[in-house]
Regions:
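Substrate-binding groove of N-acetylhexosamine-processing glycoside hydrolases
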Residues: 1-181
Length: 181
């Protein structure tokens, strides 16, 4: 326990040292950007905003689940900056790999929200057919890019989580063979 609250900057400096095993200015800057954006919600939310790619297909998605947030409450360019800063840190290790994947994923999914809104706008006008097609193709490519990014870290791969669930089902009393499939 501490006698007084630490300054956020000092805490983040200690956190990045503990997380990555080295002091790194770019990593500290990345976390400072995340602290001032995605981790700095100043309003009450029932749930966080969710990746638009997880919603049922629609041009007017405002949430993925019934409890999800309806908008992004932070400057999305700060997450882009966080991903760039963490990449520039050029560290190694599983924590660094996880965070770099996660920050990049968040920046790309935030862009997906913006891109879908622009696709919706372009779809409303016959004069925007070419813009619509370009944005649609960019959106579909963004999904593929996200899949490729997430496949670089086992923590973001579905197989890891389904295997863990199957392992738990094998241990639990009262499960049937069908439960374990």
């Amino acid at each position: 326990w501490r006698a007084s609250a630490p300054s956020p900057q000092a805490w983040l400096k200690d956190y990045t040292l503990a997380r990555y095993g080295t002091s790194n200015t770019a990593a500290q800057k990345a976390w400072e950007l995340v602290r001032n954006s995605a981790l700095n919600c100043e309003t009450s939310l029932q749930g966080p905003h969710e990746a638009v790619f997880c919603a049922r297909p629609s041009l007017t998605v405002d949430r993925v689940s019934s409890w999800g947030g309806t908008g992004i409450f932070y400057d999305t360019q700060m997450m882009v900056g966080a991903a760039h800063n963490l990449l520039a840190a050029q560290l190694s290790g599983s924590n660094y790999s996880y965070d770099l994947t996660d920050f990049s994923r968040q920046a790309l999914t935030d862009y997906g929200h913006q891109l879908l809104a622009s696709i919706n706008e372009a779809s409303k006008s016959q004069n925007e057919a070419e813009a619509y097609a370009k944005r649609r193709d960019a959106y579909l490519q963004l999904m593929l890019d996200l899949d490729e990014l997430l496949s670089t870290n086992e923590n973001f791969m579905l197989g890891r989580w389904t295997n863990m669930a199957r392992g738990i089902a094998d241990e639990a009393e009262g499960t049937t063979e069908a439960d374990r499939q």
